[in-house]
Amino acid sequence: MKDHTTIIDGKDLEKADKALIMIHGRGGTAADILTLAEALPVEDFALLAPQAAGNSWYPYSFLATPAQNEPWLTASLEQLRQLLARVRAAGITDDNIYFLGFSQGACLALEFVTRNAEKFGGVVAFTGGLIGDRIYPENYKGDFNGTPVFIGTGDPDPHVPVQRVHATTALLQNMHAAVTEKVYPGMGHTISGDEIAQASRLVFRAPVR
């Protein structure tokens, strides 16, 4: 099913007990990011993939000052807020709501959940960090209460400095997220098979085979 801004796939939202919100990267599409679900243990999940206008959630680097990426950043965060409200309205509880993003989508996912920290089902960030020319702790509130988070990144990465990944991990841990950060030397700006395996095991709790 597709509406103006979101593709909905997987189990019917009104019947599912769990939901995964999947956020594409710059230049990507909702349909692209949904294909990742085939590699993850989410067969019983409702899958929701929002589509960014112009295939980008905000125009400049995530390391630009927040003001430079306005009003697009606020609009994108609001799009996620409305999507989360829709999932909650379907009767799915926060501890069964998961977020996943790649690159710009990983940055947006991390920014959104950290501004609205709760005991979510889990968060997967394939190459991303909190948004801004620096980290603004005053923007973040709530308590993750042990939410499992996996952050994977290459080093070096052309878009996401590993130092920002480390700083993001530290802040989320201070907000009581159970963060696993894994740095892959020379991986490039992509998603590796090991990242998929780590996310499956650590966040989606798939049994080890």
Predicted ranges, named:
Residues T35, E111-R115:
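Active-site signature of alpha/beta-hydrolase-fold catalytic machinery across serine-
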Residues L100-G105, A109:
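Gly/Ala-rich beta-loop-alpha elbow adjacent to hydrolase catalytic centers
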Residues F150-T153, D157:
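Short beta-strand/loop motif that positions the catalytic acidic residue
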Residues R26, H166-R209:
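C-terminal catalytic histidine-bearing segment of alpha/beta-hydrolase fold enzymes
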Residues F99-G101, F126, G152:
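Short beta-strand immediately N-terminal to the catalytic nucleophile in serine-hydrolase-like folds
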Residues E118-I131:
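A conserved short beta-strand
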Residues M1-N96:
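Serine-hydrolase catalytic machinery in alpha/beta-hydrolase-like enzymes
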Residues I33-L36, Y136-P137, P161-L171:
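Short alpha-helix in the alpha/beta-hydrolase fold that links the catalytic acid
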